[in-house]
């Protein structure tokens, strides 16, 4: 298989327009066309706006372009829907990728005109987009997330991922010290250590002395 991983230990700097107490530990484990995304320790004191984790955001080329979530297909020009408990629900983006949420999280699905400003000139900009994002609320304390992305699955893979109880991986650890995922199809285990960590019953690693990224396949 084709495997890889990405890890970030987020701590925002003490600069203008930043929140210096914003911390999070995030990982993404890639196994073939599956990506397991994990976040823990999402904490900050920003009360003026909610903290969000984007699942996807895509430009809309026509107003009747479909947006799909939780067995709902909508071609409305404007969508603003809140799913209060998205545990197990599937969201599909405009390029055929599927996102399955694995926690009872609040997810917001939108479609329509978005406005922003140019990051250099501050000139007003706008565009039509479809998006889905996890809403952690204002000033979250130790918030988390877990979701699975399946990249452009074929017809058989779509049937499998929509089946009840679909779970192609085992989440072995998910806390502020480590994220560990075992992929059942490839037999590969991914390790993201954020600090010194001791593992009692792992087949390969006894102790990590600090920040470590590792992927180990079955012999």
Model-inferred region functions:
Residues 1-219:
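Extended repeat-based interaction scaffolds and adjacent low-complexity, acidic/S/T/P-biased segments
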